[in-house]
Amino acid sequence: MTERRLTRIHSIKERLGDSLSHHPNELLALFSRFIKQGKGMLERHQLLTEYESVIPEADREKLKDGVFEDTLRASQEAIVIPPWVALAIRPRPGVWEYVRVNVNELAVEECSEYLKFKEDLVDRSSQSNFVLEMDFEPFNANVPRPSLSKSIGNGVQFLNRHLSSKLFHDKESLYPLLNFLREHNYKGTTLMLNDRLQSLSALQTALRKADRYLLSISKDTPYSEFNHSFQVLGLEKGWGDTASRVSENIHLLLDLLEAPDPSTLEKFLGTIPMVFNVVILSPHGYFAQANVLGYPDTGGQVVYILDQVRALETEMLLKIKQQGLDITPRILIVTRLLPDAVGTTCGQRLERVLGTEHTHILRVPFRTDKGILRKWISRFEVWPYLETYAEDVAHELAGEMQATPDLIIGNYSDGNLVASLLAHRLGITQCTIAHALEKTKYPNSDIYLKKFDDQYHFSCQFTADLIAMNQSDFIITSTFQEIAGSKDTVGQYESHTAFTLPGLYRVVHGIDVFDPKFNIVSPGADMSIYYPYFEQEKRLTALHAEIEELLYSSVENEEHKFVLKDRNKPIIFSMARLDRVKNMTGLVELYGKNDRLKELVNLVVVAGDHGKESKDLEEQAELKKMYKLIEEYKLQGHIRWISAQMNRVRNGELYRYIADTKGAFVQPAFYEAFGLTVVESMTCGLPTFATCHGGPAEIIVHGVSGFHIDPYHGDKASEQLVSFFEKCKEDPAHWEKISQGGLQRIYEKYTWKLYSERLMTLAGVYGFWKYVSNLDRRETRRYLEMFYALKYRNLAKSVPLAIDN
């Protein structure tokens, strides 16, 4: 029998060195090509293009036997500073290695100071000066974390497995659970257990007595009828509204005390009423329920939050009722009050959210020592106002809620920073939702900070993001890609693992995507508004005349420009803000370039506002570009350009009307964190093509529930559209197949009911673990206080204050 041996796994440096030894001519030619381009940065796609260009196919076949091609494909970027080429290699999501090659000597070495080397691209002085380095890794050394990429985004399951084995290794270690249940209360009223129960044995005895008592009464008996008997045993309200539900929960706890396991623990914690008052932060933009969508900085995030709170309130009311409590929950969406409200309700302090009973929008103004800021300002200019804003919000919450919130949820960079300040001040559980991290949307905006900072103030924003993501108790994302990208692309959070802001600081370890604080909780679309086109009894036919006017009238005005000459064609439809990243002009260009596509279908885009001059510089530039493209490709007769539509109900029917034409929805963004419009269109049964960069790549199963397109390759995307519509022309069942595939995908994964159930469970589980373990990360918080006071504050002061006209 052959003896089995353990062999050492060679490092990437060693394997790359072997490749250079075995194929010196081919690799010298390639690296020399990199060097010839001079000092600079090469992106992954450029590296692969050069590889295929320089090395003949026959030689590439030889290289496939080794590791070089795999290493090159795993390289996300190369820094070229002759004679060195440094590679940032990502073998799998969340795992990075850095090497550099001396092309003159064909020698490879590890590049432990990769960021310092990278800074040479823009700032040679960093080599001699002391540079602040931020490193959060030592503070998280004792936080358990998985090692497999597939575990990323399943933080709560991993945490429960790890900590329950630690916490429940013997009877004595269960005391933190007993103490947690005894101390749990609402506004001073004890819930779950009272002080009669001082030991675990007393708790088990009381639970068994309660169980025997419940067997003697009807399952439907209301809790109020045996409330007094349970109080004598040491059990308070919160176990359930009926004998049946109380019995289920008592059995869960008995099972947990007898044989602890993670799933029982999570299930039990999910039944404990812990969240009654929720605060949701979203300061920037025009936050209102009507007439705001399409305004600058006002889009999917507003829709997300309004749908979120309706589902959340429904879930909270249901849980409170099921637990037998008479408590009124409260949800407050905190946003900015805009005295210059331009025809919206953004100047109103308090506004109830339609479709809810206990949820309101609370608006608090931005102010300085000179008074209240009246006008809208860009999300990139809010930084100098946020500290004072957080203080004002704390004061308003105390008066409005009359209780300390149980959970605070931040949205986007500004909301997450304010949530961090409030959570730190009030000592409450904090949840972070990024929606979009700008560092990913604007490639190389870190290393080339000086190019961006005057306009976008990314030095403030990236610092705020770093503070919020490290302080938060848990982070929810809509997709895996938001956290850790894919095999070939870097995730939004992952891009904050290590980066540099030349002249400010280096982040050598910013966030770990394996951290158990990350959880994927995908939202859905409001199914009272977005539902399939074939549900004829629900269709809003009264709106069809308006929609036909919008799409087909021969009149051009401030709401719609350009006239479609053939209304019998299917429609390619798209709806988004008019900014560079959303890439609506890219869609118009790929359509304009493809004559066959123009023959097959019309194009309808909803973006921007013809009726007013935008204050947003990016929107102004995209507006001009759109007109130029329409003229260049002679799209009059083929395109309808509609101003941003504020009416969500009509938008839902608009999706369905497009489906009636057997059209398709296209989402062409260069990057999309999630893709709410993708979910909306699929929920309406409209076949959907969406960017492969970001969340839509997970929402859509390519070829089954829709199609992925690459906005960086418009010609290929247009051919995909041609192929689809030609196939549908030959076989109408193909359109139905993709439509049904999209609906099936939505029902399985993307509904608000699933979302709200999961969010409530997460809030309870993280609140519990924060109580019984060291998950409050006190050391990290002290480090963040210093970072905020010494770095963020000065950066925020450097942002010019807005001036009211």
From Swiss-Prot:
Its EC number is 2.4.1.13. Residues 274-751 are annotated as: GT-B glycosyltransferase. Pfam families: Glycos_transf_1 (PF00534), GT-B_Sucrose_synth (PF00862), SUS_EPBD (PF24862), SUS_N (PF24861). GO terms for biological process: sucrose metabolic process. Disulfide bonds: none annotated. Keywords: Glycosyltransferase, Transferase. NCBIfam families: sucr_synth (TIGR02470). Sucrose-cleaving enzyme that provides UDP-glucose and fructose for various metabolic pathways. This is Sucrose synthase 1. It comes from Tulipa gesneriana. The lineage of its organism: Eukaryota, Viridiplantae, Streptophyta, Embryophyta, Tracheophyta.
